[in-house]
Amino acid sequence: MTIRMPNDRQRILVLGKTGTGKTCAAVWHLSQKDFKRKAWIVLNHKGDDLIDSIEGANHVDLNFRPKKPGLYIYHPIPDVDDAEVTQLLWDIHAMGDIGVYVDEGYMIPNRDPAFQALLTQGRSKKIPMIILSQRPVWLTRFAISESDFFQIFQLGDQRDRQTVQGFVPVDLEKLMQAPVNTVPALKKFHSIYYDVGANNCVIMTPVPTADAVLARFDLGKKRKQTL
């Protein structure tokens, strides 16, 4: 069965507890973007090594604003840099036609007005989004309700499964829960992939390895900017 990938206006929410392959899958989605035609920003609150290993990405300060295509990685400190992140997101909202990757959605406060504006208005402004979270119960509801695609890995907490359950047409408890010493129906590194617009839901096999995903990026010589 052929499955669709998010286009340059759509957003995907990638969920899963630590160690499920969530970040590798999200970076795999990111690797499919055309950085020669569009700028993407990455909010790497957790300092994820896989993200920081992308060759050719620009590592920039929070006061930097992209003016040309490419990949720009920011490293905000949770709580400390919240105001700067809000201003950055407002500026992206005003500029439009820039992709946004958020390494952990709950690192942005639930009521952040700029984040909510991107989630609710980003489609019309050509602002696609890739949002990750290991705890969907802590996410703003708009991150879930406004998603065009879901990729859901194993979620260990029942509250997280219940938070997402109303948005996907499969029984998450049945797929993710299993008696002691048995294997859940949703295998390791496999995920539930749901295309909301097409109402198409499949079990996706593991994405390529981290090294293979990193090799997909073609961004030229790696450099860091402090502006």
UniProtKB/Swiss-Prot annotation:
Compartments, as annotated in UniProt: Virion
Major localization listed first in the record, in broad terms: virion
One GO term describing the cellular component: viral capsid
GO MF assignments: ATP binding
Disulfide bridge positions per record: none
InterPro entries for the chain: P-loop_NTPase (IPR027417)
Gene Ontology annotations of biological process type: viral DNA genome packaging
CDD domains referenced in this protein's UniProt entry, alphabetically: TrwB_TraG_TraD_VirD4
Entry-linked SUPFAM superfamilies: P-loop containing nucleoside triphosphate hydrolases (SSF52540)
Domain of life: Viruses
Alphabetically ordered keywords of this record: ATP-binding, Capsid protein, Nucleotide-binding, Viral genome packaging, Viral release from host cell, Virion
Binding-site residues, ATP: 16-23
Protein role: Together with the packaging efficiency factor P6, forms the external part of the portal vertex that is embeded in the capsid and which plays critical roles in genome packaging and genome ejection. Both proteins multimerize as a single ring-shaped heterdodecamer arranged around a central channel.
Quaternary assembly: Heterodimer of P6 and P9; further multimerizes as hexamers of heterodimers. Part of the dodecameric portal complex that is composed of the packaging efficiency factor P6, the DNA packaging ATPase P9, and the internal heterododecamer P20/P22 which spans the virion inner membrane.
Protein name, UniProt field: DNA packaging ATPase P9
Species this chain originates from: Enterobacteria phage PRD1
Name of the gene this protein is made from: IX
